[in-house]
Curated annotation (Swiss-Prot):
The gene is chdC. Its cofactor is Fe-coproporphyrin III. InterPro entries: CHDC, ChdC/CLD, Dimeric_a/b-barrel. The lineage of its organism: Bacteria, Thermotogati, Deinococcota, Deinococci, Thermales. Fe-coproporphyrin III acts both as a substrate and a redox cofactor. Was originally thought to use heme as a cofactor. Keywords: Heme, Heme biosynthesis, Iron, Metal-binding, Oxidoreductase. This is Coproheme decarboxylase. Involved in coproporphyrin-dependent heme b biosynthesis. Catalyzes the decarboxylation of Fe-coproporphyrin III (coproheme) to heme b (protoheme IX), the last step of the pathway. The reaction occurs in a stepwise manner with a three-propionate harderoheme intermediate. When reconstituted with heme, can generate oxygen using chlorite or hydrogen peroxide as substrate (in vitro), but has very low affinity for hydrogen peroxide and chlorite and extremely low enzyme activity. The active site is at Y145. GO terms for molecular function: heme binding; metal ion binding; peroxidase activity.
Length: 249
């Protein structure tokens, strides 16, 4: 039997990412005195302004989304240069007065990742650098889902030679490039960090584009044979005014 020679993908890592999904106890929130709700709002607004200042200083990015369906009400999406500032962002939200009305529904921790199957990428490349530290769009919609590469029988991604993986990913990338200008994609790796191997964020001004790109990519061999997908979350970006309206203030 021929011995399998491991050929791991070359990766570059960027910002750390936390998808923090929360449920809002609407009954408790609206039964609270207006003064208490206003105080909670002012504290939350101050926290978000701190996140905005960090983004403007190039020390991270953020987005808050109203999530459709029963899986969550809000997504607090934060990107930071390391785990420690990401933990601080999570803790600050959890210690806030607004958190008294929130419950945790799902979370995913990962690190922005760029991969090359055959040769290392140049971290100083003007093409590579911005993709390692992406800025979350401040409008439109997000679609997030975790995924794995299959390791089952003959469909074992990790047993494929690097050249074959490269060929499959190239075809997959060509499908994605059809949506350039319509969908922004951020891939983050989570091997050893969370329960799935990757997180995928899609950003668009038109949520129907999420359906189109995911459906078309399902026909790529790399997805049809080797892709395993977790839950999908779709949300609408909330600026300060929209977030306040969502909270009924």
């Amino acid at each position: 039997m021929e011995r399998h020679v491991p050929e791991p993908t070359h990766t570059l890592e960027g910002w750390h990412v936390l998808h923090d999904f929360r449920l809002l106890d609407f009954a408790r929130w609206f039964s609270a005195p207006l003064e208490a709700r206003e105080d909670a709002w002012e504290e939350l607004k101050g926290l978000v302004r701190e996140w905005r200042e960090l983004e403007e200083a190039g020390q991270g990015s953020y987005g808050i989304y109203q999530v459709v369906g029963h899986k969550a009400d809000l997504l607090f999406l934060n990107l930071r240069p390391g785990l420690d500032p990401l933990l601080e962002a999570e803790a600050r939200l959890s210690r806030s007065a607004f958190a008294r009305y929130l419950g945790r529904s799902y979370s995913f921790y990962s690190v922005v990742e760029l991969g090359s199957q055959e040769k290392p990428l140049d971290p100083e490349s003007p093409y590579v650098k911005p993709r390692l530290t992406p800025r979350v769009p401040k409008s439109g919609y997000v679609c997030f889902y975790p995924m794995n590469k299959r390791r089952q029988g003959q469909d074992n991604w990790y047993m494929l030679p690097a050249k074959e993986r490269a060929s499959l990913m190239k075809a997959h990338g060509e499908t994605g490039r059809k949506y350039q200008g319509k969908v922004m994609q951020v891939i983050s790796g989570a091997q050893g960090l969370d329960d799935w191997e990757w997180g995928v964020d899609l950003f668009s001004e038109d949520p129907v584009q999420f359906k189109k790109i995911v459906y078309e990519m399902r026909f790529d061999e790399v997805s049809a044979r080797y892709g395993e997908f977790g839950p999908f979350f779709v949300g609408k970006y909330l600026d300060e005014e929209a977030l306040r309206a969502f909270l009924g203030l």
